[in-house]
Every structure is written in structure tokens, then in C-alpha cells.
Amino acid sequence: MFQTINEISIHPELYNQKKVLIQGWITNIRGNLKIIFVELNDGSSFKNLQCVLKKEFIDFDKIENLALGVAVEISGIFSNTPERQQFGEVLVETLEIKGNNYNTNFPIQNQEISLEVLRQMPHFRHRSRLFRVIMKLRSALFFEIHKFFRRQGFINFSAPILTSNDGEGAGEVFIVDDENKDFFNKKTTLGVTGQLHAEAYALGFKKVYTFAPTFRAERSNTRRHAAEFWMIEPEVAFFTLEQIIELAVKLLQKVIKSVIIRNKDEFIFLEKAGDKNLRKRLLQFCDSQVTQISYEKAIELLLEHQEKFEEKDLFFGCDLKTEHERFLTEEIFHMPVVIINYPKNLKAFYMHQNEDGQTVAAFDLLVPGIGELIGGSQREVRYEKLLARMSELNMNIEEFQWYLDLRKYGNPGSSGFGLGFERLLMYITGIENIRDVIPFPRTSKNILM
């Protein structure tokens, strides 16, 4: 029976002086004519296991092809070594090469490789230590989010990927068709949001959420934007703006704390590699009340520091840039902040129109280092108000009649939000570029393999 490095590293004392059998890949190799030290990784942990090969046990002539990246199967006696930095090592009794290299130029060498270089080989970069940590935390975060919603009584809803509706109204969509250009007999795109369809399912299930790929044909070449990313979108019938904000904050605080508690070693690694205060900063947010201000107040605060911005044209109705969002979180509040009641011209057509006639019941949750992490709103449930807004924006009413019809039959109103999964992972890990927290990034002018 095979053991994993993760199992052994968690309780090395249980395996002390016992025989272990492990399959994995060589990440480091050094030695001389009498003894060879091999570091092995099997993917179960970002940690490597040191394996000691001695000439009296192993025929070195049969393992002359050992090199970085080679796949092997080893058996031997494990020794727990708490007095050293490593958790233990294996004195190898047998070693079998399971996958040789065809040449000596294995892409992930034992030297510092820049993130820019690693982006050019997304099919290999997860075999570096940093990306093992990132991808393990990505997986852990994925499951913590599903666990949170299950405990809160939500139904997981699979929104369609192909759709005839642009839920955001920005027109930044990828058009899908077959070679004959008439497969659906109407314009069909990859979904930019699952929200509209989730609203339909919230009327019946009350609490639903989607967690799925999302596609935006944004040509923004920034470190925060990707053409394909994952989005978490809960929708709750009967909820007001304040209730959905409370849910958003609770979600973040719960999943962040859980990921930190369950992945201590990964965070220690990240702190050594980058932000020394990563966990302290995240846990401070998890244990704090989040400040909430109006969009109007945000503009007032930013105007007091107008000279510090590249974009100095600040007024009621302007779209806040990333530099403004980050300034609010990093220089004024020093932690995440929620902004509510945006001008309606800045937001999507479906948002509840406030009594002032100028703003909508929308919110953005901003975090340091990134800016907007979550965007959400209370939905407009009044049929005539929604229809008037859609007409004002020259939308195709016929295409959205099904969405309008949701207002006709027992609709108490609903609220929801969208949370970018990769942006959340950036915030949690301190990684600064969205291309480095997704396995195979797709951005403008870039689609490797």
C-alpha cells in the first residue's frame, strides 16, 4: 500500500522506523559515488521528502538516468528527524524509474525562476514549489466555499454557460457558433454571469448559488483581469441590500479563516517568500467589523487627496478606478471597506432604483492590494421600473421578456453578488497577478495551449 508525503509529514512519528512505499517526481538530486540524496514530491504536499540512496543497497549503474523531473517509485525505511529542518527521510531499499526524461532540459530547475518566465509554461509551472502551494490553496479554498454555502442551506445551481443574454449589459462577450453560423438561430455567447438565471431559481429555492467559469471579452491588460475566470454568485429571495452585504462579509471571513487554519504550512511558506504579515492581516479582517460608506462619501474622501491620483477628475457619477479603490482600503481605512448606493448610470440595469432617482441599491466590497473583490445589489422587482430602465438603455426587451416575467408571479425581491474566485485567491495568498492563481490563464492576446 502506498503512502503519501502529506500523510507522513503530518504525523512523522507514526511512521518512524517503518517501511514506506511512495511514488513521485524528483525535485532535487545531489551526492557522490557512495551516497545520493534525492528529494521527492508526490503532489500530496508542497513539501519534499528526502530519500537517501546508499551504494550498498542500490545499484548506482541502474539509476544513472536519475534527474530532475524523473518519475520514480521507492521503498525504504522512514526515519523521523525532528532535530532537523525536515520532518524525516527514507533510507531507500528499492528504486524503480517509472518515467524517464527524454532530454536533460527539464523546465523546472533548482534555481529562482521569475513568475513571468513560468507563465510561458503553464503545463509545467505547477511542479515548482510556489505553484504547488498556490494550487493546493486554490483547491482548499474551492471546497471551503462549497462547504460554507451547504452549511448556510444553499442549493448549488448550475447556470448555463451558453446564453442569449448579456447579464451585465457591457457588450464584452464571446460569440459562439458552429461553422455554418446558424446553430442556435440567434446570437449566442459565453456567459458573463449566472445571475439572471440564478434569480429564476431563487424564486422557488430561496437560497441558491453558482460557482462556475465566467467569460468576459475585456481587453484590459491588467494584473486583475482575465478573459476566463471563476465566479461565485449567490442569490437569495427576500433579501435586502443590507442582508446580502452581511452574507458577503460572513462568507469571506469564514472561508479565509478556515483556509488559514487548515493550511498552516502553506501560509508559513508564503510568508517566508513574500508578505511576512500575511496571516496577521487576513485574520485582522476576519475578526473585525467592516466599514460601510456611501459612494458619495467615498468621493468626498478621495477629493481630499485628489493630488495623489493619476485620475484626478473625481465627481459624483465618475467610475472609481483601481487606484481610488486601493487608496480607500490601504491609506484611509487600512482594511476592506464596503461602498453602497452607486449612481445608477455606473451599474447594471437590474439593480433596485433608490428613492432619490439617482442611485441604486448596489455595493462593492474593496480589499487592499486589489480593489473591487465583490460586487452585488438588491434586484429591481418592480416591473414598470425595470422595464423603463431597460428601455432607457435601448435593450432588446423581447430577449429579456422572460426576465421581466419573473416579476409577475410571486416575486418578493432578491439580492445577490458576484465574487471573483481568482481575486479572492490573490487576496489570500498575496500573489499580485491573476495569471498566477489560475492553472491556464486566458487573457487578451494570450491563450497558450
Curated annotation (Swiss-Prot):
Q: What is its main location?
A: cytoplasm
Spell out the subcellular localization from the entry. Answer: Cytoplasm
Q: Which reaction does it catalyse?
A: tRNA(Asn) + L-asparagine + ATP = L-asparaginyl-tRNA(Asn) + AMP + diphosphate + H(+)
Q: Which UniProt keywords apply?
A: Aminoacyl-tRNA synthetase, ATP-binding, Cytoplasm, Ligase, Nucleotide-binding, Protein biosynthesis
| Matches recorded under InterPro entries | Aa-tRNA-synt_II (IPR004364), aa-tRNA-synth_II (IPR006195), aa-tRNA-synth_II/BPL/LPL (IPR045864), Asn-tRNA-ligase (IPR004522), Asp/Asn-tRNA-synth_IIb (IPR002312), NA-bd_OB-fold (IPR012340), NA-bd_OB_tRNA (IPR004365)
Annotated SUPFAM superfamilies: Class II aaRS and biotin synthetases, Nucleic acid-binding proteins
Give the family per the record.
Answer: Belongs to the class-II aminoacyl-tRNA synthetase family.
BP GO terms, sorted = asparaginyl-tRNA aminoacylation
Membrane spanning segments where?
A: none
By its UniProt entry, which Pfam families does this protein fall under? tRNA-synt_2, tRNA_anti-codon
One GO CC annotation: cytoplasm
Q: How does it assemble?
A: Homodimer.
Q: What is this protein called?
A: Asparagine--tRNA ligase
Looking up PROSITE patterns in the UniProt record yields: AA_TRNA_LIGASE_II (PS50862)
Source organism per UniProt: Mesomycoplasma hyopneumoniae (strain J / ATCC 25934 / NCTC 10110)
Protein's UniProt keywords contain Aminoacyl-tRNA synthetase:
yes
Quote the PANTHER family the UniProt record gives.
ASPARAGINE--TRNA LIGASE, MITOCHONDRIAL-RELATED, ASPARTYL/LYSYL-TRNA SYNTHETASE
